[in-house]
Every structure is written in structure tokens, then in C-alpha cells.
């Protein structure tokens, strides 16, 4: 089967902050030892205050991102309110579990801010969903990322501090994991805004780490 021959690697991280959440990924997509893309998108905006990161099969991730965005839009129309982070995580969990015998080859983070506060959920390929109370990393570079996150995370960290820590964690993984690399994407979400950092802003932070 193709899944026995094609492997995907990546690094994604999520941090719960006192004023929001931060999600970050690198941009490399691989097929075994082959670098298939240096511009892979791994963070998807789901609602105005919720995003999803993906690790795993690119095709499965893109399809799920489209499907989840449509379903959340329908939810908003029917309920006349935005879904909570937990509601989106539950939707994704149920969807993945419904096809568990032919699973989507993905590991996801759903993070955002709603009326209950800042939340991040990690979801495995067959729908297991866990609320992460502080930090989380997924993908082949996660061991290196966790080392940085666990040494530097604080319960009172704010989103701006968390952006720098997330970039540092991804950068550490990129140096040691061959399946991670080729740039970084970062999103910070607060009660008031959803911000995707520009390449220039990310590069300025990286310069301080080199």
C-alpha cells in the first residue's frame, strides 16, 4: 500500500497563554527522504478566533480543513453564534472516529479563544481528543520542540512572549529533524484579534536566535 511507502514529517507546536493561544509550524513537506515541498501550509484558519495545525498526509489535511471550515460556517448560520473551540474539536473528533477503519493520516491541533477562554485540543487520527492545558507539540520534530517548550514555558506567559518561544521551539526542531524545515508560520489568537505573523516579523525573531 502507498501508506507503507510514503511517510510525512513535520513539527507543530501550540501554547496556551494568559491572553490567548499561539500556534506555529514549519513549512517542509516530505515523502520519505524526498523534500516534496518547501512551502507547505500547515496552519488553517477555521473561524475568526480558531485555527488548526496539521501533521501528516497533505491531501488528508487539506480536505479536512475545507470540510471543517464548511461545517463551522453552517454551525454559525444555524446557531447564529460562533462555535466554541471545544465544539470544533468535538466535530473533528467525531468525523475522524466515524472513518477510523480507513483513517485520515493526520494529527491535528485545534486552538483558539472563545467565551470560555483560551483552549487547545490535540486530536489523533482516529478521533481521540485531549485538551492541552499548557503546551503541546506534534510531528517528527516534537521531541526537540518539547525540550525547548518545557524549559521555558510559564503559566503567566503572554502571546507575544509565546510567539518567540514557539519560533524557538520550531527552530530547534528544524536543526535536528530532517523532515522539518524551510521556514516557519505563526498565528497568535486573542479575544480581540487573529494575527498571522509576516515573514519579516518571524525573520527578525530568528535573527536573535542565530
From Swiss-Prot:
Cleaved signal peptide residues: none
The protein's GO terms of the molecular function aspect are: threonine-type endopeptidase activity
Q: Which Pfam families match?
A: Proteasome
Known EC number(s)? 3.4.25.1
Per the record's keyword annotation, is Iron included, yes or no? no
List keywords of the entry alphabetically.
Autocatalytic cleavage, Cytoplasm, Hydrolase, Protease, Proteasome, Threonine protease, Zymogen
Cellular compartment(s) = Cytoplasm
Q: Which residues form the propeptide?
A: 1-9
Q: What does this protein do?
A: Component of the proteasome core, a large protease complex with broad specificity involved in protein degradation.
Q: What is this protein called?
A: Proteasome subunit beta
Gene behind the chain: psmB
Amino acid at each position: 500500500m502507498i501508506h507503507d511507502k510514503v511517510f510525512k514529517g513535520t513539527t507543530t507546536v501550540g501554547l496556551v497563554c494568559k491572553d490567548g493561544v499561539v500556534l506555529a509550524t514549519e513549512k517542509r513537506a516530505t515523502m520519505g527522504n524526498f523534500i516534496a515541498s518547501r512551502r507547505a501550509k500547515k496552519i488553517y484558519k477555521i473561524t475568526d478566533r480558531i485555527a488548526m495545525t496539521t501533521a501528516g498526509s497533505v491531501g488528508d489535511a487539506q480536505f479536512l480543513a475545507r470540510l471543517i471550515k464548511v461545517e463551522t460556517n453552517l454551525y454559525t448560520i444555524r446557531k447564529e453564534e460562533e462555535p466554541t473551540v471545544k465544539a470544533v474539536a468535538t466535530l473533528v473528533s467525531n468525523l475522524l472516529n466515524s472513518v477510523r477503519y480507513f483513517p485520515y493520516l493526520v494529527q491535528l491541533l485545534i486552538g483558539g479563544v472563545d467565551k470560555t477562554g483560551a483552549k487547545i485540543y490535540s486530536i489523533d487520527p482516529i478521533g481521540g481528543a485531549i485538551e492541552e492545558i499548557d503546551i503541546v507539540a506534534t510531528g517528527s520534530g516534537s521531541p526537540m520542540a518539547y525540550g525547548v517548550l518545557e524549559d521555558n514555558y510559564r503559566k503567566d506567559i503572554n502571546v507575544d512572549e509565546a510567539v518567540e518561544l514557539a519560533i524557538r521551539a520550531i527552530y530547534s526542531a528544524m536543526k535536528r529533524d530532517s523532515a522539518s524545515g524551510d521556514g516557519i508560520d505563526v498565528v497568535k489568537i486573542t479575544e480581540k484579534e487573529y494575527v498571522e505573523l509576516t515573514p519579516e516579523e518571524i525573520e527578525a525573531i530568528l535573527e536573535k536566535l542565530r
